[in-house]
A protein has these predicted regions:
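Hydrophobic alpha-helical transmembrane segments
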Residues: 1-140, 145-206
Length: 206
């Protein structure tokens, strides 16, 4: 095998591994779309459960940093973590749960649902779409692609329209979510997107 073929094989393996990690990570994002339905039936118990999950994850991730593995949680974290998170505290799940909790506490149910859906589907599918189909990188966005941004736009457009049934509001929310997603916020987009989109939907639906 030539050096070029060997290098190509390594790159292909790295690409497949990154897609696998992205699928695991974004499947967790998408599952958060179930939370608004749970909140409808048991608001405070769900908030309490999310808080417990948040505290438990922080504790398990802290232990993992010190070489103590917590069954299931530490394994999922290692499987889903990005290369930039290796040997670091993986912050994504913390901001994900915080984003859901803060959105649910701040906004009325319909607006909170729209915000959480923007997180679950818009942000959840954007990076996956970018990795699978992204060819053109948008300047000054730390690697964000046109494909990823369009995925975010259409995901939020559809999910918000499913809730509010208003084309203008849905379009405004989708454009706003796409704009926020372009900002290189790192893991804090999990917090900013649902809170901001929930707040904007509150203003637009008055």
């Amino acid at each position: 095998m030539s050096a070029d073929e060997n290098r190509a094989g390594i790159l292909q393996a790295q690409y497949k591994n990154s897609i696998k990690k992205e699928l695991v990570r974004k499947s967790i994002h998408i599952c958060s779309a179930l939370i608004p339905s749970f909140l409808t039936f048991a608001y405070w118990p769900v908030i309490a459960c999310l808080t417990v999950v948040l505290v438990f994850y922080i504790a398990s991730e802290t232990l993992r940093k010190y070489g103590i593995s917590v069954p299931v949680v530490s394994h999922i974290t290692e499987v889903a973590s990005r290369k930039r998170d290796e040997n670091k505290f993986v912050l994504g799940p913390v901001t994900l749960v915080l984003g859901i909790i803060v959105t649910a506490l701040l906004w009325k149910p319909e607006a909170a649902r729209i915000g959480i859906y923007a997180l679950a589907f818009g942000d959840g599918l954007a990076s996956l779409g970018g990795k699978l189909f992204g060819r053109t990188v948008i300047p000054f966005t730390h690697g964000k692609t046109i494909a990823g941004s369009l995925t975010c736009f259409f995901a939020v457009l559809c999910s918000s329209f499913a809730v509010c049934k208003n084309g203008f509001v849905s379009l405004a929310l989708a454009l706003s979510a796409m704009a926020i997603e372009l900002i290189p916020l790192g893991d804090f987009d999990n917090l900013v997107i649902p809170v901001a989109i929930g707040g904007l939907s509150t203003l637009l639906m008055r």
